[in-house]
Amino acid sequence: MQRRWKYSCIMAILATLSVTPHLQAAEMQLPDIRTQPTPQAVLDEHIDALNKCDWNRLVAQYPEDAQIHLLNGTIITGRKAIGELFAGFCKDPKDGGLNGINFKVIQSTLIGGTFATHWVASAPFLAEPYKGSDAYITKDGLMQAMVTTFDGAALKMKK
């Protein structure tokens, strides 16, 4: 039953995200691009903005040709699409988003301009912490690309 509920929720979120960009595109004003002085500052800004669900700060990190690689080969390309992705992420949990989730970096290694980062996510609405890893590719003070293991379907929500 819980698995069916999770599946239904995931499908509803995906359906909402597939329609939402068309509805929000006309009203979505992308923030100015804002560079950071070091790769570490790029990562720190991303994690802090993500934890605060600060959409403007999140999207300000990504250049026009940025990419986010999700599970199952899904690639989100460009600032507008990335903005739409984070708009869905930053909704309240009751609206299908994850506002209030907190990512804590457990270990991070910088290789060139790329971080291999292990993190744990927790939130008042999660039944247990969720662990994952991301690769954050920085370039010229921006978040050029991200590859994530994050799987919203694997989150265990409180009942």
Predicted regions and their residues:
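Hydrophobic pocket/interface hotspot
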Residues: 46, 58-59, 66, 78, ...
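Surface-exposed, charged secondary-structure patches
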Residues: 83-129
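Bacterial N-terminal signal peptides that target proteins for export
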Residues: 1-10
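Short, low-complexity N-terminal intrinsically disordered segments enriched in polar/charged residues
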Residues: 23-60, 64, 157
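Bacterial N-terminal signal peptides
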Residues: 9-20
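Short beta-strand segments enriched in hydrophobic/aromatic residues
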Residues: 62-63, 121-123, 150
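Short beta-strand edge/turn micro-motifs at domain boundaries
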Residues: 129-159
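A short gly/proline-enriched turn/hairpin at secondary-structure junctions
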Residues: 67-77, 91-96
